[in-house]
Amino acid sequence: MRAYRVAYDGQPYHGFQRQPDVDTVEGRLRSALVRLGVCERGEGLPDRYAAAGRTDAGVSARTQTVAFDAPAWLSPAAFNGELPNDVRVWASADVPEDFHATHDAAERTYTYYLYAPADADRPEHEPVDDGRWADAVDALAGTHDFHNLTTDETGTERTVAIDWTRDGQFLVVQLTAGGFCRQLVRRLVSLAAAVADGSAPLSKVDRILSPEPVSGPDGVPPAPPEPLVLTDVRYPNVSFTRDEDAAVDARTVFARRRATARTTARVADHITDGL
């Protein structure tokens, strides 16, 4: 039984979990395992397979974790040989036979890179007040019933820790919990951002956290998925070993993507600033 750390760019995919007729990260992992002879053709997955989480369409990951009965020779580098460049396995760990990648995760951390300029000369975005942002985050952190911030109908009481820092025109937001309801991270960010830019009063946080259902125009839409990354999944007593060749390969792949994205942003800056 072995667990693998997987990094991926989620933007081209319809989420992590396999779905019929659409491209998903898990579907790519399974196809690679079929070609490697680890998984039989058909619809099944390897014995005792489980994943740490189900990221939404457009959401990326640095430490998605999958575990299953794997042959000794299946190193991260061997796995990568059958995967697309935007899905990279970079570490692994031998785990007990009863290990479950979903249920045994003690904590999951997501990082959201919120574009939030504080200056008022950005016509494409309302200026963000860091003080209002902090007030909203303080009110949302802790243990609450988040039923108004998820599409889930049960299991909506969670304890969420929220840390954040300003990095230039971005607020880098880290949210940690034992587990998250569906869309909870993105809706938490969306609500705090609405308070921070003045489009919603701070009192809306209390209303959203109240027992009364809030939906429709008064509800909270999810923030866009593309700035969200699954950045850590912690398992007690599991120590992952980085495959240096696979890690170098993954860094190279994502460095190229970073360069492309920065070039695209620079071109957009040039056009925007010249109009």
From Swiss-Prot:
On whether GTP-binding is a keyword of this UniProt record, the answer is no
Q: Name one GO molecular function term.
A: RNA binding
Keywords in alphabetical order: Isomerase, tRNA processing
Task: Write out the function statement from the record.
Answer: Formation of pseudouridine at positions 38, 39 and 40 in the anticodon stem and loop of transfer RNAs.
Q: Which reaction does it catalyse?
A: uridine(38/39/40) in tRNA = pseudouridine(38/39/40) in tRNA
Q: Which family does it belong to?
A: Belongs to the tRNA pseudouridine synthase TruA family.
- Supply the name of the protein: tRNA pseudouridine synthase A
**Annotated EC:** 5.4.99.12
* Pfam families linked: PseudoU_synth_1
**Binding of substrate: at which residues?**
Y110
What superkingdom heads the lineage?
A: Archaea
| Residues spanning the membrane | none
Metal-binding listed as a keyword: no
Cite a single GO BP annotation: tRNA pseudouridine synthesis
Q: Where is the signal peptide?
A: none
Task: Provide the active-site residues from the annotation.
Answer: D56
